[in-house]
């Protein structure tokens, strides 16, 4: 059963400007610990796109749950990883998953400088 659909678009240029002002603070604000480890391994030229995609993905997932970031879920409650083929995998913190019995999250990410887009579908697995 469909729980919700969410989408978000982010200007990569906007993230570049934020990174110029706050090089480490922004990443620490929106990335979960596993994502921060990935981020640290990236070439600096990839930082803005990586952060823009994670920001858009987390916004899209929160919208698919029918809420927004800061309305019962925050950036660090959602972790975006990739499988061996690059497919995005979404992990939601245990504190949030207690609100839903079981669900599947489908996420698609795309970027074409200067924008990136995320599209999320949350469905009940019951």
Curated annotation (Swiss-Prot):
Single biological process term from Gene Ontology: fatty acid biosynthetic process
EC code: 2.7.8.7
Catalytic activity: apo-[ACP] + CoA = holo-[ACP] + adenosine 3',5'-bisphosphate + H(+)
Cofactors: Mg(2+)
Gene Ontology terms, MF aspect: holo-[acyl-carrier-protein] synthase activity; magnesium ion binding
Name of the gene encoding the protein in the UniProt record: acpS
Residues the record lists as binding Mg(2+): 8, 59
Top-level taxon: Bacteria
Function: Transfers the 4'-phosphopantetheine moiety from coenzyme A to a Ser of acyl-carrier-protein.
Gene Ontology CC terms, in alphabetical order: cytoplasm
HAMAP family membership: AcpS
Compartment list: Cytoplasm
Protein name as annotated: Holo-[acyl-carrier-protein] synthase
Species name: Rickettsia akari (strain Hartford)
UniProt entry keywords in alphabetical sequence: Cytoplasm, Fatty acid biosynthesis, Fatty acid metabolism, Lipid biosynthesis, Lipid metabolism, Magnesium, Metal-binding, Transferase
Family: Belongs to the P-Pant transferase superfamily. AcpS family.
